[in-house]
A protein has these predicted regions:
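Extended, low-polarity segments enriched in aliphatic/aromatic residues
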Residues: 89-154, 171-177, 184-387
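Glycine-rich, N-terminal phosphate-binding loop of Rossmann-like dinucleotide-binding domains
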Residues: 26, 162, 252
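Ser/Thr-rich, Proline-interspersed low-complexity disordered segments
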Residues: 40-97
Length: 387
């Protein structure tokens, strides 16, 4: 091939070649070209054996992570509350309302909505929406009416214990009326519902419509003294209205208290007896716990709904807006969450929150006596923001 190239180069340089030499060179080039084509045609790719359908190609297995290294599954979302009946079996009252120490923890649900206030008044529809969301999260049940039916039978006489001792920071009527609405939706007659606090005057000043014996929801103060509660510090009498009730929904509002540290669900029942002043010694401890342990309170209480749309961290007539409802079956756990909210607001105002914590010593006594949980490790806190 080198000689051929040399000869071609010579031809390009103008050196003549003979006819015989030209024919020889041409035949050699043709032979080389044919040899290349033959090599191309015969060099077919090696055949590939397709995989057998019943025997797929094996692969090296990927090692599974150890269980300890697996991330914890996310918490399931709260069910979407609905008023449509559920095909599932309705919850039973004992299983629904159980809390610590009968269960491992006590659940408290905090539902917030930044738009709940319209000027100086709460929006009733938003409050009702907050209540539904809280009941659904508390019970892990989307069918909120099934929960209310479990909490009250048609023949029950349900007392809603509100707190109206201060016109500046009472239980907001919109919260009590939302509870009334759902009790009626669940089948309870309006006449079997009583919105109650110790005096007519305090109820009226807080914005409630009084009704004593007329058609519709009842609303009035105490109507006479009834059964005795013999406590360590003093003997007091429940008002007859507590004796007559077969079920209680406790609807307090969180506020500071000079003799108890805080007043939320437990302290609210000082308005259920005739001589509350006799129970204020030693930071209301253990009187406040013993009172709530009485069958007239403990056995009848179905639910606690903390009206924390506004709270009173220092001055009852200077409330702070929290835009929240606190909902639980455990009054001690709810009071603990309410106390922490009061602490936050007082500190935000530059105040010392020590008395709120040290003064609420009855919470520890309540846990020791099995009334509910105040230890943070025993409280299952669920917080929901709707808007």
């Amino acid at each position: 091939m080198k000689s051929t190239q040399s000869q071609c180069a010579q031809e390009r340089q103008g050196h003549p070649i003979s006819r015989r030499t030209f024919i020889g060179l041409s035949m050699g080039a043709l032979a080389a070209w044919l040899a290349g084509c033959r090599a191309t045609i015969t060099a077919q790719p090696s055949p590939i054996t397709p995989p057998t359908p019943t025997s797929p190609p094996s692969s090296t297995p990927t090692p599974e992570p150890s269980p300890a290294a697996s991330p914890a599954p996310p918490s399931p979302p709260s069910p979407t509350p609905t008023l449509e009946p559920s095909p599932a079996a309705p919850p039973s009252l004992p299983s629904l309302t159980s809390h610590w120490p009968a269960t491992a923890t006590s659940r408290v649900v905090v539902v917030r909505h930044s738009g709940v206030w319209v000027g100086s008044a709460p929006d009733p529809q938003i409050v009702l929406h907050m209540l539904d969301a809280g009941i659904s999260a508390l019970s892990d049940t989307a069918d909120v009416l099934a929960v209310w039916r479990a909490l009250s039978a048609p023949a029950d006489r349900v007392l809603l214990k509100v707190n109206c001792i201060s016109a500046g920071g009472p239980t907001q009527p919109a919260v009590a009326y939302a509870v009334v609405r759902r009790l009626q939706d669940a089948g309870l007659s309006a006449e079997n519902i009583l919105i109650f606090d110790r005096t007519d005057g305090e109820l009226a000043a807080a914005g409630y419509t009084l009704n004593d014996g007329g058609p519709g929801v009842q609303c009035h103060g105490a109507r006479g003294e009834g059964s005795v509660a013999a406590l360590t510090q003093a003997s007091v009498r429940f008002y007859q209205d507590l004796d007559a009730a077969t079920a209680i929904v406790n609807i307090p509002t969180p506020k500071q208290h000079g003799s108890a540290g805080v007043s939320v669900a437990l302290k609210n029942h000082y308005g259920s007896v005739n001589r509350p002043g006799a129970l204020h010694g030693n930071w209301c401890d253990p009187a406040i716990v013993e009172l709530n342990a009485q069958p007239n309170v403990r056995d009848k209480t179905r639910l606690v709904v903390g009206a924390a749309l506004s709270v009173s961290p220092d001055d009852w007539n200077r409330p702070a807006r929290e835009n929240a409802l606190l909902i639980s079956f455990d009054p001690v756990a709810l009071d603990t969450v309410g106390r922490d909210i009061l602490v936050r607001h007082r500190q935000a105002r530059g105040g010392d929150a020590g008395s709120l914590i040290e003064g609420a010593r009855h919470l520890g006594t309540a846990q020791k006596l099995g009334l509910g949980a105040t230890d943070v490790n025993l409280i299952d806190l669920r917080e929901i923001t709707l808007g």
